[in-house]
Amino acid sequence: MHVGLLYSRIRRDEKLLLSELRDRGHDVTKIDVRREQFNISAAPAVFDDLDVVLDRCLATSRSLYITRFLDAYGVPVVNSSETAQLCADKVKNSLALEAAGVPTPNTTVAFTTDAALEAIEAFGYPCVLKPVVGSWGRLMAKIDTRDAAEAILEHKATLGHYEHKVFYIQEFVEKPGRDIRVLAVDGEPVASMTRSSDHWLTNAAKGGETAEFELDDRARELVEKASAAVGGGLLGVDLMEVGSDYTVHEVNHTVEFKALNDAVGDSVDVPNRVVDWLEAKAAAETEVTA
């Protein structure tokens, strides 16, 4: 198998994948997207003879455009541009989950500060204001008072970028001090962990403590449905425990897994399982084009 790996920086996640691919004897072409040019009618030569391309772009904007180019070129890419589009934007993500009947936090979107403040007041305090594009828990705000709401909305309105004029307001979910991250391939869980913190944000990137987690049948069902809702692929599905059930608050398309790999230890070889799936996907693509 000849794999192309899109990157702008090789992180530990990519090193784990590269090591597993090379240990199996696969050819890997690393493609630094900062150096490439993408013509609307002809693919760059670096994509010739690749069986599959793995998108590991750090920047969401690059990921969205490059996967769209690869789809147009007919080059198999993980994940597809359709999946990337649905996962990269929290509004589209929430709409996809809701349409698929996946329990997800109640969310309202507004486009002016006045309308956003009305929505916040309707939710009551606390509620959550999130950027529509972003990761690692950045620029997320738990709003506890009207004064805080007015200040944060003013700051967002002043930031300038059009994405900050889309106010994504969500109910605050009382979770048991943790959430759950599941790495899945086409809806099948590979490994899962909890991320715990005394802070309301439990992201591993913000220092949340991780521990292996065993999924029950209900969680597995929701992971499968959430994956299908965005088109499948190599995904990170985030859930919160709500009473005896779960709510899915996000599906991630360029998922990091180094913290998960550490959390599960010897019980699951995460890069091994990912490459197993990648091999099967490349073989299926070859059969289709044969």
Model-predicted segments: where are they?
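Short glycine-rich anion-binding loops that position phosphate/pyrophosphate groups of nucleotides
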Residues: 58-60, 133-134, 254
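Protein kinase-like catalytic core scaffold
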Residues: 127, 168, 183, 190-191, ...
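Glycine-rich phosphate/pyrophosphate-binding beta-alpha loops
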Residues: 252-267
